[in-house]
Amino acid sequence: MTYKKAVKIKTPGGKEAELAPEKAWTLAPKGRKGVKIGLFKDPESGKYFRHKLPDDYPV
């Protein structure tokens, strides 16, 4: 289940936008603290891109 909480990020076009990720997951090596990654869709170009999510974002 995807949690749709909007976060403020920078799009590949260089603009700041407040978007909700379509998918979110944790990326971590064995035995280490990982980072949270979100899959976003650029509203201007329609292309998908990945961006780091805040640590307090529920996955």
Curated annotation (Swiss-Prot):
Would you say which domain of life the source belongs to?
Archaea
Q: Which Pfam families match?
A: Cren7
* Localization, UniProt: Chromosome; Cytoplasm
Q: What does the record give under GO molecular function?
A: double-stranded DNA binding
The reply to whether Transmembrane figures as a keyword in the UniProt entry is no
State the UniProt keywords alphabetically: Chromosome, Cytoplasm, DNA-binding, Methylation
Q: How is it modified after translation?
A: Methylated at multiple sites, to varying extents.
Q: Which GO terms describe its cellular component?
A: chromosome; cytoplasm
State how it assembles: Monomer.
Q: Which HAMAP family did the record assign?
A: Chromatin_Cren7
Which family, according to UniProt?
A: Belongs to the Cren7 family.
The role this protein plays is: A chromatin protein, binds double-stranded DNA without sequence specificity. Constrains negative DNA supercoils.
Q: What is this protein called?
A: Chromatin protein Cren7
Q: Which species is this UniProt entry from?
A: Metallosphaera sedula (strain ATCC 51363 / DSM 5348 / JCM 9185 / NBRC 15509 / TH2)
Q: What gene does this protein come from?
A: creN7
